[in-house]
């Protein structure tokens, strides 16, 4: 997300303490046996790290073909110079693919740091501030392929194969996918045995899923995906209730999941979005397995990708924003980009390339598209998409908030304790959250300090106008309602980050307006998780869009080089006629 607006609070109180490697012998994930926490505690002997050669879904078989394209053929065309606007995951994915094919790549980013929606930075007190909570499903094969390519496959921590719901009063519900037999039986067992729903709701839930395209996905994944696409014009709630599902199931289970996926609830989310996930969960054993980075995204995700790009000869230009896309119209009416008007503080320059990629978020691409281009339906459709506001809150405590079994353990600071996983809740304004001191310890566990809760407030609309202090006050109160045992623990540091438009709002009927990566403008391409690809708006979707953008560019390499020669000849002709090209461009 190269150009979204974000606002950061000043910490209420500075956190102090020496950073330390997550201690061996720290309590790990708690195992639950009923509506309340059981007395069993699984103690993790060491932080679980895993490479990406195991516990990953095989998306090359029995999966929709568009979700994980085959490796591209070796490019044999002319070497191209490509300018990419935006150093988010989509832009960097595009860059990696193009560099691997031998092209020359420059990435321009208006911010001082890279990563877009998966970016992070360090504040003046040394605290890592993230743009949101990032969780990796086991079916993120395009992203995992990228991480393996750049040498970051050891940077993800595998969590217990269960989805945990924290209800008011500290009551825990689960979708437990740990089962001796894999898909689809592990999923059936998880839904039938969940203690998050009452028996009647579970039965109606099972009926609804049995009547869904998810069943067809077991034998015909591409046909099922087409059926799922055809359901884009109805909300998930409308579809689910029409198949016999209950409102209680939506409120207690599916709304928190929907908020975590797309920052909107089931009443406002397309059935396509939710059913895409369900189909993968049903057919791929590891699709529902969660991973989280072992530390901050800037160090363990964006950092390795940036290094790979630079080692391959790619260049990053930070704080350079694109102010205007310069273009010309040929005699036949076709359009092409002639350059990008860039600026950095008081500096200005025109960037020229053979191909241009706008790897922006929804508000970013809307600002970038020339007004004239909106006469084309392709570009005008983009303006029918809107981003969802989201607020991310970090709270550092002087104890372990999610430790529910042992009050004394929750007060000591020698060892980390609590729930090490992504956590959902139907009973707070933050639908999903995690204790990063447990889940991503390398940067977030600090010796002598406690939990670092990262809470994602969705929908973020009601919180956008509030002061940071008021937001912290409300979130802290809701945390206490979920974890009454945390009474008496104090918040020692906090941060608030507001993003006016994050993921695009995946509401009913919006999928047809998502643009392809190839545009009607001959040398102008798009990338971004909002663009057309078979997954949802996500890290995986962003990575896949980058692969698709690169493929489109390589497929028309000869034409792009011919266009570049044509443009150069026209510019030389203008110069020979005494036209000052630089003056002309400066006036645009």
From Swiss-Prot:
Its main location: plastid. The keyword Transit peptide applies. One of its GO terms (molecular function) is 9,9'-di-cis-zeta-carotene desaturase activity. SUPFAM superfamilies: FAD/NAD(P)-binding domain. Gene3D superfamilies: FAD/NAD(P)-binding domain. Its cofactor is NAD(+); NADP(+); FAD. One of its GO terms (biological process) is carotene biosynthetic process. Pathway: Carotenoid biosynthesis; lycopene biosynthesis. InterPro entries: Amino_oxidase, FAD/NAD-bd_sf, Zeta_caro_desat, Zeta_carotene_desat/Oxidored. The keyword Membrane does not apply. It is found in: Plastid, Chloroplast; Plastid, Chromoplast. Catalyzes the conversion of zeta-carotene to lycopene via the intermediary of neurosporene. This is Zeta-carotene desaturase, chloroplastic/chromoplastic. It comes from Solanum lycopersicum. The gene is ZDS.
């Amino acid at each position: 997300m190269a150009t979204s607006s974000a606002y950061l609070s000043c910490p209420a109180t500075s956190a102090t303490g020496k950073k330390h490697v997550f201690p061996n012998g720290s309590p790990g994930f708690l195992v639950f046996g009923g509506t309340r926490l059981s007395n069993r505690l699984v103690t993790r002997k060491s932080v679980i790290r895993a490479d990406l050669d195991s516990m990953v879904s095989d998306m090359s078989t029995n999966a929709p073909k568009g979700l994980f394209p085959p490796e591209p053929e070796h490019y044999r065309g002319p070497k191209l110079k490509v300018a990419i606007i935006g150093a988010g995951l989509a832009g960097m994915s595009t860059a990696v693919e193009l560099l691997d094919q031998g092209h020359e790549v420059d990435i321009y980013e208006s911010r001082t740091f890279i990563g877009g929606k998966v970016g992070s930075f360090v504040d003046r007190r040394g605290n890592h501030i993230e743009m949101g909570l990032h969780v990796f499903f086991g079916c993120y094969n395009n992203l995992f392929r990228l991480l393996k390519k750049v040498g970051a496959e050891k940077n993800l921590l595998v969590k217990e194969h269960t989805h945990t719901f924290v209800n008011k009063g500290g009551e825990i519900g689960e979708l437990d996918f740990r089962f001796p037999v894999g898909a689809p039986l592990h999923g059936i067992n998880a839904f039938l045995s969940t203690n998050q729903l009452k028996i009647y709701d579970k039965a109606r839930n099972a009926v609804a899923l049995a009547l869904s395209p998810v069943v067809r996905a077991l034998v015909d994944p591409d046909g099922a995906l087409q059926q799922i696409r055809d359901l884009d014009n109805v909300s998930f709630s409308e579809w689910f209730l029409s198949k016999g599902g209950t409102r209680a199931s939506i409120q207690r289970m599916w709304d928190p999941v929907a908020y975590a996926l797309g920052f909107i609830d089931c009443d406002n989310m397309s059935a396509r979005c939710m059913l895409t996930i369900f189909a993968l969960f049903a057919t791929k054993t590891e699709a529902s397995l969660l991973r989280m980075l072992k530390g901050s995204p800037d160090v363990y995700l964006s950092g390795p990708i940036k290094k790979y790009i630079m080692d391959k000869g790619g260049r990053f230009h930070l704080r350079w924003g694109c102010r205007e896309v310069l273009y010309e119209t040929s005699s036949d009416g076709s359009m092409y980009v002639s350059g990008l008007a860039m600026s950095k503080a008081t500096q200005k320059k025109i960037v020229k390339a053979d191909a241009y990629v706008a790897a922006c978020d929804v508000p970013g691409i809307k600002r970038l598209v020339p007004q004239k281009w909106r006469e084309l339906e392709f570009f005008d459709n983009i303006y029918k998409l809107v981003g969802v506001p989201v607020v991310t809150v970090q709270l550092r405590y002087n104890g372990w908030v999610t430790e529910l079994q042992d009050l004394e353990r929750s007060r000591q600071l020698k060892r980390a304790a609590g729930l090490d996983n992504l956590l959902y809740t139907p009973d707070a304004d933050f639908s999903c959250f995690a204790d990063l001191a447990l889940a991503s310890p390398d940067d977030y566990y600090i010796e002598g300090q406690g939990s670092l809760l990262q809470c994602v407030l969705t929908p973020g609309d009601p919180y956008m106008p509030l002061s940071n202090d008021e937001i912290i006050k409300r979130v802290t109160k809701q945390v206490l309602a979920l974890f009454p045992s945390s009474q008496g623990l104090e918040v020692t540091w906090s941060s608030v980050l507001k993003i006016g438009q994050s993921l695009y709002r995946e509401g009913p009927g919006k999928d047809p307006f998502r643009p392809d990566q190839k545009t009607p403008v001959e040398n102008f391409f798009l990338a971004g998780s909002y663009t057309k690809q078979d997954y949802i708006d996500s890290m995986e979707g962003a990575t896949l869009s980058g692969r698709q953008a690169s493929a489109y560019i390589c497929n028309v390499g000869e034409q792009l080089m011919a266009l570049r020669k044509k443009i150069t000849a026209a510019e030389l002709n203008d110069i020979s006629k005494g036209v000052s090209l630089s003056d002309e461009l400066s006036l645009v």
